[in-house]
Amino acid sequence: MELIRRLFTAALVAGVLSGTAASVVQQATTVPLILEAEKYEVVTPPPAPAVAAPGAAAPAAAESHHHGPVREVGEGVPTTLDEAMQRIGLTIASNLLTGVAYALLLSAAMLLAGRPVDARRGLVWGAGGFVAVSLAPSFGLPPELPGMAGADLELRQLWWLAAAAGAGVGMAALAFARNRLVIAAAVLATALPHLVGAPHPESAEGAVPPELAAHFVTASLGSAALFWAILGAVCGWLISGLVGEAEHRPALRVQPGAR
């Protein structure tokens, strides 16, 4: 019971620290990009050109050339201070919950591995989490801004789970497995989602400018890397004592003839 309590305490501390740091960074990097992209969510088509006489076709074409789609502010853009603060609060709460959940998984994996761990080794564990959860899935499904074209949500979620699980299994096999067949199977599991391909819409057209989308991908991966670095280092530092206790815990011995 003491082990579980300390495990949850370590996960809570690591999750709060990493979630808070990610929230601060996102307010300066990804959130402004999201707000900018939401301005492109509502697009009013340009007015249809009026049918004119053959002699007026050229002026009409020239006039229609200067009229493009009218951009309007999307409904998700906060217009008051209360709405903005509410969005910030929801972002922080989401990051904190996500941090605690991932910290529990990472701490449990450290204990199950049974290897010595500290803040430095925890940083390596955090790098593995970043690769599995953020980097590997981004090769097929990079972070998307509002207003970008996307395939069916359920298909994307299933592919993301397969890519993240495959990357995690592959790295675990490379780090701990000794059987070559196991390693080969794990590598195949890592590559399989990417060989099948991520689900994409039939048309990649979207209202968001490509340079804005590319900037968002790099900013999102950067904040995710910071999140996992803090998460792994803090988890490793706090879990180090638990792993040491588990290694030196005396095994239960049964005396001959005892019942």
Where do the language-model regions lie?
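Juxtamembrane/disordered regions of integral membrane proteins
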Residues: M1-R259
